[in-house]
Regions:
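Short S/T/G/P-rich N-terminal loop/turn motif that feeds into the first structured element of a domain
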Residues: 1-57, 65-72, 99-100
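C-terminal structural segments of small proteins and small subunits
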Residues: 64-89, 93
């Protein structure tokens, strides 16, 4: 299994919405991927960050069968649609993938 963690900082305003509104939309669209991509075993997203250093506004944690499944997820058209939105509203991104 491979765990994929991503932390984003968001622009104060983008796409006519506040960072909080865009964070809520990110949570909605990313969690909607559950059960839709083969090899994606678990996904959770939070825009309710208690504390983070460095600062982040949204965090994603997903688990995949293996590295091939992670690569499939990352290239999947439904995931790419999420990526297109996130790129418009995010100002920064940090990610880590590791075997569990």
């Amino acid at each position: 299994m491979v765990r994929h963690i991503v932390m984003w900082t968001l622009k104060e305003e983008a796409e006519g919405k506040t960072a909080a509104e865009n964070g809520a939309k990110m949570k909605e669209i990313l969690e909607a991927l559950a059960g839709r991509i083969e090899g994606l075993r678990h996904i959770e997203v939070s825009a309710d960050i208690v504390a983070a250093d460095p600062e982040c506004h949204v965090i994603l944690c997903s688990e995949h069968d293996d590295v091939d499944a992670l690569n499939h997820y990352q290239g999947h058209p439904e995931h790419q649609a999420c990526v297109a939105f996130v790129k418009k509203v995010a100002s920064g991104r940090k990610a880590v993938d590791y075997v569990i």
